[in-house]
Design a protein with these regions (language model features):
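A broad structural signal for short, well-ordered beta-strand segments within beta-sheet-rich domains
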Residues: 26-37, 153-157, 207-213, 319
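Oligomerization/assembly interface segments of phage tail-like spikes and tubes
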Residues: 32, 36-57, 97-110, 173, ...
Length: 344
């Protein structure tokens, strides 16, 4: 096995993928450049994307798998970085040479391209994970799996909107059960529980953050310190007067108000408890960090990573974006975030 925290030699190979068997096909020659990005942000994330430039002729569309073969002290290991649906976007012709530029989309793309006609919904009581997987299989060529523990019963029906994509409906269904979608390096789509255990320990199992100068973004400018809930003649107010909170009345020296005139308390919840709950919910902000690290197979966007290097970065974060630098090895520029509660 490769120790990915140490140096290794590697070879990059790109294979055409048979959409029927999902196995490697012929190797693609003449690959001049490769790029891969992963992004789990937004309402309907496609998760993976990329691009490549190829010398010579290449089919204008097809699935291709980007694979790394690493060698270290006699050990050999293959890691699939991404499998994407590539389409030609440009062609350059020179004196005796030609190159094609291709743009790669996630294996989820066919579900984003297909639109709902209206009336589609996932009924209450349905296994939401199985429902989502079936919808994806109806659109996508890639294998679709349901991970262990991903099944759940929908409490309420989830309706699809006419003109929305099948993928947006799938995301609505899986999020209703606190689940997520993952796309693995071989292109397999997985309906899975939201990860709760770190997939990577930076500073423990894997030592190196190559660029320890991390970008930090913690925006507290829109966090209120007073919520007023009004329900007819009834009024309830919740305030943040915690001197230890950076957004409290004491810390700011002024009130930042949110007024809700159509409150929706839970069953048995008083208006005062509702106002306090809303203030807590609105007091959660995203603590965002960015760093460069070495590549480790199997770590994907949406995973948790624990940083334990004895500095300001220490903590557990969820990976939001990954950019792969594919050269003599692989480095990953990673943006990750964690929720910070500013009032409890």
């Amino acid at each position: 096995m490769i120790d990915w925290s140490r140096s290794y030699s590697c070879e990059w190979r790109v294979f055409r993928v048979d959409p029927e068997t999902w196995a490697d096909g012929a190797r693609l020659g003449g690959v001049d450049s490769l790029e891969v990005q992963s992004d789990a942000t937004g309402d309907v994330p496609l998760l993976d994307a990329g691009g490549m430039t190829v010398s010579g002729d290449v089919p204008p569309q097809g699935y291709y798998r980007i694979a790394l073969t690493a060698r270290q002290d006699g050990a050999i290991e293959r890691a699939d970085i991404a499998t994407l649906l590539f389409e030609a976007t440009g062609r350059e012709v020179g004196r005796g040479t030609a190159s094609v530029t291709l743009s790669g989309r996630s294996t989820l793309w066919p579900a984003q391209a297909r639109l709902l006609t209206g009336g589609e919904y996932a009924p209450a009581g349905t296994d939401g994970a199985a429902w989502a997987a079936a919808l994806l299989r109806s659109c996508c060529h890639a294998p679709v799996e349901v991970a262990d523990g991903a099944g759940f019963a929908l409490r309420d029906p989830v309706w699809g909107e006419a003109g929305a994509s099948v993928l947006s409906h799938v995301w609505d269904v899986v999020r209703a059960g606190g689940r997520t979608l993952r796309v693995m390096g071989d292109g397999t789509i997985v309906v899975a529980p939201l990860p709760t255990v770190p997939a990577l320990d930076l500073g423990g199992d894997f030592a190196a953050i190559i660029d320890p100068t991390a970008r930090v973004a913690l925006d507290v400018s829109e966090v209120p310190n007073r919520v007023t809930a009004i329900d007819g003649a009834n009024v309830a107010v919740a305030t943040n007067e915690d001197a230890g909170s950076p957004v409290s009345h004491q810390a700011r020296g002024y009130w930042y108000d949110v007024v809700e005139t159509s409150p929706t308390p839970a069953e048995g919840e008083t208006l005062g408890a509702y106002a306090a709950r809303r203030l807590r919910e609105l007091s959660v902000v995203s603590d965002e960090r960015e760093w460069v690290r070495g590549y480790v197979p199997g770590v994907r966007v949406g995973d948790l990573v624990r940083v334990a290097m004895g500095g300001a970065l220490d903590g557990t974060y969820r990976i939001r974006t990954m950019g792969y630098d594919l050269g003599r090895g692989v480095t990953v520029t990673e943006r990750a975030s964690r929720e910070v509660q500013l009032w409890v």
